């Protein structure tokens, strides 16, 4: 039997399956259709935690507020005529008390040989999903509790929960079986609730800045907007290859040409490349473009957006504390303005190398001595890519506080305007960094269609000389759109998964993705 079905033969599964049959034999549907009219545990706590409700006797006399909830039973203990359980609803837990003389089981026949309290003790298990109707009271220790009048089985769990003390210690199991991770870990639930809130807050911020949210195709005839290897698929209806997008950029610029002054998209992007602590082949991005601004204005947008997010998540404070850094615990202030530094200056400041004092051969020697890059990766690289490699190797990890690194070499992108100072070897591009991670990429967008064509053709010629490079056709539709006339514009892209990592102090991108890409198990090939 394959690994994915091993649980079917486990003793606990068989034992719970027998209980399931016994419950069904009593005429109780263990998987009912609905349980309407519930309140959330959070709502109940917010409304009643500060009220004077009375004790268990008041609840028994039905003199306290009646409530109705549903959730998963995660703790249970029996104490004579009473039994206590903890019910997990979303990210909140509440204690419930079953009483031998007061509590009933929905659907249990009056003439059943088993009493309600014995049914609760013998037929229900940790992990079962229960509907609870009852009366609120405070225990002697002051804990808000529901005295259960009626319990309804909403979903019988046939597989045990992990041990409550050990939890899920194996990371791979956590990532593959995220549902268990969510059940067992308050911290994990909070991380994903925070992720959802971050995306909601981003939309609120962008909408308040008069950006229009749009949707553009994931399947594309030609991929572009970034240097990355695409996923390729076949569209059977047209008998043609299609690509999963590697960027949102090109389609959004076409919309800008069409007259929409400010546009953004939050969506999935796919790159058929490596998997590591900060990269997943499928990831979520926001890209945004606005007419009549340059990369200086975009820097302000980006740092104000991040400052806003931190403040909303942190009760108004712009300061976050991090525990997962190899440098040890750090406190970071995200208040704008952030540190601004050119790429060349950052290499001089953090790497101790003034690239203007060194020729290409010397830069290669520095990379050989001070980086872990294979020599063949930069042996024939042009000067701009040597400078970019020095930055990656000598600087990135040292950018703990928020930085904007500006004025990148031309060779790093064909989609950006050159410096207005006239230095055509450098472009008005910045990347934002924090905690040693790239957070944002942004440009003063190139709007000259003839220069854009020249740069794309030059890029294609270089790729043609590299046997390891894939053929990357020029997007003629994009160039035609630019020929229609594109206004001055600034744009940025932020990887939302990496942003969530930073805002939740998560050590790996897998910790902020519900279901990260994982290696296929051998059993899945059976």
UniProtKB/Swiss-Prot annotation:
Its cofactor is Mg(2+). Its EC number is 6.1.1.6. Mg(2+) 2 binds at residue 438. Gene3D superfamilies: Bira Bifunctional Protein, Domain 2, Nucleic acid-binding proteins. Keywords: Aminoacyl-tRNA synthetase, ATP-binding, Cytoplasm, Ligase, Magnesium, Metal-binding, Nucleotide-binding, Protein biosynthesis. Homodimer. This is Lysine--tRNA ligase. It comes from Chlamydia felis (strain Fe/C-56) (Chlamydophila felis). The gene is lysS.
